[in-house]
Amino acid sequence: MIPNRWRDLARRDIFEPLGLNGSYFIPNAHNRAHVAVASKYSDEVDIDFLDVMACSGGQMSSLSDYIKLMQTFLDPTLPQSLLPAHIMREWMTPVFGFNDDETEVGLLWEIVKIQDSYCRPVRVYEKNGVLGASRSVFAIHREMAFGVALLNTGTATVTGNIALEIFRIMQPYLDKLQERKVKERFAGHWRLPLQTNATSGSMVDISVSDGSLWITRLVLNGTDVLSLTEAMPAFGGARSRRVALWSMRRDEFRMVLGAGAATSCMSSWTAMDSGFSRGYPMDLVYFKGGRLHIPSAGVVLVRA
């Protein structure tokens, strides 16, 4: 039987598959004892928003259901997740940015930018619910796989600010945790498995600074790459002898070898995949099985 009301369709296709047993549209004998009623505008609890508005303003929910749904967004690989990772990646993207340089909109999402420990912008993807005396916030920090769910009654308009303040408080601790994990996974001296001569062969030194991964030494098949690419006149002469690693996806990076005044395009644009060898981009680096791979040079390194 095909549902002919929004509430029945939502129950069949969303609530039941996700196990959301605390979400509904009007109070009934089963859920009445769990409904939070404000002292002001209390009548809105009993309003039936009908099919026209039930999907946008007439749904009640519980903190437990918010958490269940948020977990599927934070980890699309969970068995109960309805949306695969590639859909989530495309969905959680800004569509338009406002002139304040702090707020943006996406497909459904209300996006606010905060700063991490290194003054870099971090996007918080939110969906806020506001009635006369009901407030809700469903907010996700995508990069850190961390979310905040908040429900309250009352007419105060501080719910969204409370959620953002939680993110701001947590951000420094998440930054430190991430930096420690990144150091454990990637930082150090990488060399050929049987290499004994430190002046020949191939080796890479990777460090973590200001929350980013950097290559401070890059020798491939006996050639000091950084002494060539970072001191070329076309790149503005001698520059800092280190290059950043730009994350593409899990354990895969591009070396940001950069471009200088000789090009008129954005440096990040022209720095990507500027050449190929052996069928691979020359700036491609990836980690697999505890080894560092630079396929364009045919080099596989282990950490010393």
Swiss-Prot record:
It is an enzyme of class 3 (hydrolase). Its EC number is 3.5.-.-. Pathway: Mycotoxin biosynthesis. Pfam families: Beta-lactamase. Coiled coil: none annotated. Keywords: Hydrolase. The keyword Hydrolase applies. GO terms for molecular function: hydrolase activity. The structure of strobilurin A was used for the development of the major class of beta-methoxyacrylate agricultural fungicides since its beta-methoxyacrylate toxophore targets the Qo site of complex III of the mitochondrial electron transport chain and prevents adenosine triphosphate synthesis. Compounds such as azoxystrobin (Syngenta) and Kresoxim methyl (BASF) are among the most widely used fungicides worldwide. This class of antifungals are used as effective treatments against a broad range of destructive fungal plant pathogens and make significant contributions to food security. Gene3D superfamilies: DD-peptidase/beta-lactamase superfamily. Transmembrane segments: none annotated. Belongs to the beta-lactamase family. Beta-lactamase-like protein; part of the gene cluster that mediates the biosynthesis of strobilurin A, an antifungal polyketide that contains a key beta-methoxyacrylate toxophore that targets the complex III of the mitochondrial electron transport chain. Strobilurin biosynthesis begins with construction of benzoyl CoA by step-wise elimination of ammonia from phenylalanine by the phenylalanine ammonia-lyase str11, oxygenation by str8 and retro-Claisen reaction to form benzoic acid, which is activated to its CoA thiolester benzoyl CoA by the dedicated CoA ligase str10. This is Beta-lactamase-like protein str6.
